[in-house]
């Protein structure tokens, strides 16, 4: 009994289903039995078919194989019934066909392999070429088999003069092969004159034979073995001072290279320390005179040493002498005719330097030359047949050019020159060892080892390149010439807007946490985030043209988005200024800050816009000392303010007026490019002679080190302490007649003079007359008459107290040079000058100042008097006592005297010993030091009331509980950069009482006369504005309070000063006072968040 019989028996015994009568079931059973067991033998059992139809195979149902349509497709599903035996891979026939095909392929490959093995060297090249250019390998194998038969036939019929038919077939085959060669050869890389060049398939140059080695010069293994010159000084003709060269190279690698990563630092240093070859080598080199001079020209913009100026004392000529040498090399040495990797890199650096000097037209030409040459040598293509190090150098150079291109496109509003359809090269690899090398801020005073951290240069560069890809697509759509002046349609714009917005959000989400903007972050990371927010402004700025009714963005306000991101750029710029300083920043920051300031001007007179535009023009003024493009940016903002009829804040207007008078109306035509004749800098002392023994020692040491670790500059030149320049290293008397040293600066701790006391009294009277906010700006911007910026500090005054290893310009040997040059370091000073008398700290306020005679010294650094108060008390040993007003007047004198030192490009960070220093440079606090030292000294049981009369650049810490900060009684003048706001008392008890008293007074005044009531309200408003101004433009941060309870109310203690009004938190965002925390009136109300 089979399974169908069992099924039929079970169906007969089964009870009827619901809704069917037994009679119906009984009557239905014979019909089923009849249909299954009919007289037709074909219906008794489903026949087995070898191939089911495609529809049944897809449904995984049984198919009866009927033609033209099976029963399932015809009766049940009504689908098209198609049979395809070849699509069923389970059939034996299919496997048989595959087996035959594999045998044929095996025979073809066997013929080709045997032909290559048995052919001569000349014929092997021809066979390989035919294999590469063929359409079918079987035809090549058949052709080779016929050739072998023809060769056999020719040997058998030597006497026959009649050509054979296969010979004519071979001629025909060669003709067809030529057609294929012409059609299939798409491009190749070839070496010409020692460099790799790419020739495309449409060029007939591709069929030229490879150049022979006979025309090339033999490779020169020995480099300056008998020359009397330091290898480092062979790269430039401008100076023969090795310390100056190393100093400027370190400036470049410390501040510019991390953002514009366009070369392999390890390969560059490998060739840099060997010196310039005596002749043109055949092998690829990663250092050239053109590249070094371009680096030195850029490095001059981050330093104020004597050798950085082409004309002593003229900041407009920084780096011009090295740039002129680079231009000379391009023209006279025909560098533009020799496509090389180093030339691509040098031209890119020269382009961005020209932009920083306000010569965009020339910089655009240099960038175009760089990008064209990059494509000429095939950097945009993925070439895997080269050495790994060369492949890495080519990739990092291309992606560096890619970043340069996108920055240029954003800067000039032009289309990218390297769009994504022109390259297929992968991104460069991240080497953990290289990214783990420590980075620390480098200034004219040396390295700040307290801020060292992993550099992560390559990892950051990859993130920036991804962001530039988004920027490229944004520019190509919204800023394409075909899109300007006419819309592409709202639907297309919204679709592209949504895509780019999503990509920007994904980039931000996928960004590693270590690259978040935070206190102590790397400078290139901060600039990268500024570029990220700039893309949002560029993305939504085209939608500002729509009115609210016609805007395709119903629930999105483009102006608000642009404002938010402009505010973020301003916050990041303040963070950069706090962590480092704006004298050492890439010039791309000028453009990004300019974009943000433009949005701020549209939002005037809003409070946040007034704050940000004021800080923006002050920051641009600081950057203008090193980057002439910032001077023109200030002029543009001044012109726009008049054109748009915008009322700028008073302090911003004063800054613009001052810069207009100092720099004039900046014009590109007024900034000539340096000529091609580079002025030579005569060294202050003769360059040390190099003997053959010294050269041999250098070569031996270098070879030994390179053999151990050939491509790691940090391991190449390890040094126990940070090296430093000697006193005679960079100072050049012939170039700087007016040298400003720290000893020439007045003593900031000297007491005030009567004239300053009178000025202070005048300030108080103006404050009482409700004119404080006007005179406050005037005091802030009073300074000495403008004069050329002389920052030529000799390294005699800039030695670091930790740098003790002796290397002098006159006694430095080759081995010393190798031991002291690091990827981030410079040679050290001589022992004779490293004494206590000549040691100068990294910070100007730590240096020994001359004492003014006939005047007693005042207390320099304020001490925290009582817990929770901002009133500065003198130490017990002091013989004088000072009122808060006198202390503030002392600060004003300090600010006036320390104006010159504020512009120095030396130390930026506050040392723990001077956490409450009042110097102009120390207007911020280090967060870690603040809470480590300040918190333990607070009395958690209650403290004194914080006041607004801080005498320093910062507000002292207020008590976390107990008395409240005095927000209205005593408003501090600005001191150096503005008196810090009162430290936040935790509770609002006294503030609430004070507020109640004020309300009672207002009620009494209201009962007297309506006119007096209006006058009182106006005075109160002006007083509150002055209060907000004092804290708004005070120190970046006051001492913060903590959560506490006072008089039945719980509130967040106030960290006064800076951008946080009194009563603000001071805890949540105490980096640079980025967000406005707390009540806007400073009366101690429950604070909110920005």
UniProtKB/Swiss-Prot annotation:
**Which regions are flagged for Basic and acidic residues bias?**
167-176
Q: What is the lineage of its organism?
A: Eukaryota, Fungi, Dikarya, Ascomycota, Pezizomycotina
DNA-binding region extent: 53-81
Domain remarks in the Swiss-Prot or TrEMBL record = The glutamine-rich domain might function in activating gene expression.
The organism sits in which domain of life?
Answer: Eukaryota
Source species, please? Neurospora crassa (strain ATCC 24698 / 74-OR23-1A / CBS 708.71 / DSM 1257 / FGSC 987)
Which segments show compositional bias classed as Polar residues? 1-14, 666-677
Where does it primarily localize?
nucleus
Q: Where is the composition biased (Low complexity)?
A: 849-859, 990-999
Where can this protein be found?
Nucleus
Its recorded name reads Nitrogen assimilation transcription factor nit-4
Give the protein's biological function: Pathway-specific regulatory gene of nitrate assimilation; it activates the transcription of the genes for nitrate and nitrite reductases.
Where does this protein have compositionally biased stretches of type Gly residues?
940-965, 976-988
Family matches, as SUPFAM superfamilies:
Zn2/Cys6 DNA-binding domain
Q: A GO molecular function for this record? A: DNA-binding transcription factor activity, RNA polymerase II-specific
Which GO biological process categories is it annotated with? Answer: DNA-templated transcription; nitrate assimilation
Q: Which UniProt keywords apply?
A: Activator, DNA-binding, Metal-binding, Nitrate assimilation, Nucleus, Transcription, Transcription regulation, Zinc
